Amino acid sequence: MSYQEKNAMSPIIDALVPMVVEQTSRGERSYDIYSRLLKERVIFLTGQVEDHMANLVVAQLLFLESENPDKDIFLYINSPGGSVTAGMSIYDTMQFIKPNVSTVCMGQACSMGAFLLAGGAPGKRYVLPNSRVMIHQPLGGFQGQASDIQIHAQEILTIKQKLNNLLAEHTGQPLEVIERDTDRDNFMSADQAVEYGIVDAVLSHRGE
């Protein structure tokens, strides 16, 4: 995950999105596949974590809470990580809203993606069997006067400590273990992620 004061919005690639057609009492109604799954309280967090994507995820979380504050939300994650500030806006919203947010890793949850995966509701955090999880310390760079660099260096250390404390809380690992294991890129298999406490179970089949 990266710490940056200014994050350039990653380019949004227009792609062909499948449409779903439903029969209603008023005739046919078509949805794009993501809107249809949103009706089932499913949100996708895919690709780089950045401000635009984070705003979309936060908006969907708030909308689903307004629709039904007592029903679980399912957040599917396939992300290499990204901006700390964007990721924390998603994390704080997950903790703020009333519904439990169940997290599911498909493909990969690295860096901020892994942090959000661990931040799901206790007992409702899952990983698919061939996915990978990676944790590490925040990354960042800054140019400017020596005094400004010192300020930003202190800020990234503060963020590192905050993230480590939260990860320790969600995984049940001692803080010193988290500090050691996030010092460098630390990749885990699905089973290792369960053992570490980032997720609660490996899902191999729908019925589990």
Curated annotation (Swiss-Prot):
Query: Where do the catalytic residues lie?
Result: S111, H136
Top-level EC class: hydrolase
Listed under catalytic activity are: Hydrolysis of proteins to small peptides in the presence of ATP and magnesium. alpha-casein is the usual test substrate. In the absence of ATP, only oligopeptides shorter than five residues are hydrolyzed (such as succinyl-Leu-Tyr-|-NHMec, and Leu-Tyr-Leu-|-Tyr-Trp, in which cleavage of the -Tyr-|-Leu- and -Tyr-|-Trp bonds also occurs)
Which domain of life does the UniProt lineage start with? Bacteria
One GO CC annotation, please? Answer: endopeptidase Clp complex
Q: Which InterPro entries does the record associate with it?
A: ClpP, ClpP/crotonase-like_dom_sf, ClpP/TepA, ClpP_His_AS, ClpP_Ser_AS
Where is the protein localized?
Cytoplasm
| Gene3D superfamilies the record matches | 2-enoyl-CoA Hydratase, Chain A, domain 1
What keywords would UniProt list here? Cytoplasm, Hydrolase, Protease, Serine protease
Pfam families recorded = CLP_protease (PF00574)
A Gene Ontology biological process in which this protein takes part is: protein quality control for misfolded or incompletely synthesized proteins
Write down the EC number. 3.4.21.92
UniProt key word Cytoplasm: yes
Q: Name one GO molecular function term.
A: serine-type endopeptidase activity
PANTHER family in alphabetical order: ATP-DEPENDENT CLP PROTEASE PROTEOLYTIC SUBUNIT
Family designation? Belongs to the peptidase S14 family.
User: How does this chain assemble?
Assistant: Fourteen ClpP subunits assemble into 2 heptameric rings which stack back to back to give a disk-like structure with a central cavity, resembling the structure of eukaryotic proteasomes.
What is this protein for, i.e. what is its function?
A: Cleaves peptides in various proteins in a process that requires ATP hydrolysis. Has a chymotrypsin-like activity. Plays a major role in the degradation of misfolded proteins.
Specify the protein name. Answer: ATP-dependent Clp protease proteolytic subunit
User: Which source organism?
Assistant: Vibrio campbellii (strain ATCC BAA-1116)
